[in-house]
Amino acid sequence: MNYLFWSLPFLVIILLFVFYFGKIMLKVLPPKVKNYHLIYWISLIILIGFNIYLRTPLMGFLIYFTLFHMIYDLLRLLSYPFKKVNNFLKKLNYKEYPILVISILFTLYGVLNAMHPVVTSYNIKVDKQVDEPIKIAFISDLHLGTPYLNENFQNLIKTVNEGNYDIFVLGGDIFDEWTTEKEKEHFFEILKEIKTKNGSYYIEGNHDVLNEETYQKYTSSGVRVLQNEVLLIDNKYYLVGRKDKMTREVQGLEQMLKNVDMTLPIIVLEHQPTSVKELEENKVDLSISGHTHGGQIWPANYFVKYGYYDNGYSKSIISSGYGEWGMPIKTTYHSELVSITIY
């Protein structure tokens, strides 16, 4: 049932791709052979399906080509009672060139943006005594196997090692359904190069498969896997790692924090953002999460959370992730390593 639930939206999107792209190309390409309509539509479905499977940047182009055509058609429909405006819009998209050019520009920007991750820094003041600043390096949503990521991950290791961080956190969705075993093995070898004062930590995401084998590989790479656990780090602050909500095994914060010293800072790590109400009720100083990708594809960023939130007592940081899912483009926020200093 869940498979059907998630498959239907993708099927609708693919049909929209085929409809808009096919409709335009049938205008541009003259008929050359018998039954060319049927041949063309079948070929187009195969082409789009092939690019979805390979996760190429063309997927981004198809999304924007379809989206801008839908917006254009909606404007034409709304302006129908106003003949001059309607005629202007009709002339504006001369032979589809404007929408074609805009779609290409959005796609190129998304590719370049995905290729160049940035360091996003936050300085967080908490309402508890912090004798020395706590420095955290956090990444999530690598989705290893996405193009550009292998080289970027080498640069990431260098950045973390030069940053003099207290801890390094992997915030889930490190792998996904497309990650190969070779890519996983390479990743675990690179993880061994991470150097921080108090170690590296991992929480699982909704795309991760945390079986016994994967658990052991993280451990062998020097990474502590947190599954509904509370750790006291260096006798200075608590690190709370929760299982992902999709596992249906996540514990409530009230239960997890019942034996902690509430005079010390409490930092909650969870792949999907925790509810503000639960954070506030349990006096959590900071929660760090990912999952949303910052929307990844404009205008999805208007419908998800990203960045820093002051909830009152507690603070939240939601990362856009270090990688991309589904296709190697990002037209919303940058791919990022989140650098946090708590004082």
Predicted regions and their residues:
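Short N-terminal secondary-structure initiator segments
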Residues: 1-2, 109-122, 179-188, 257-258
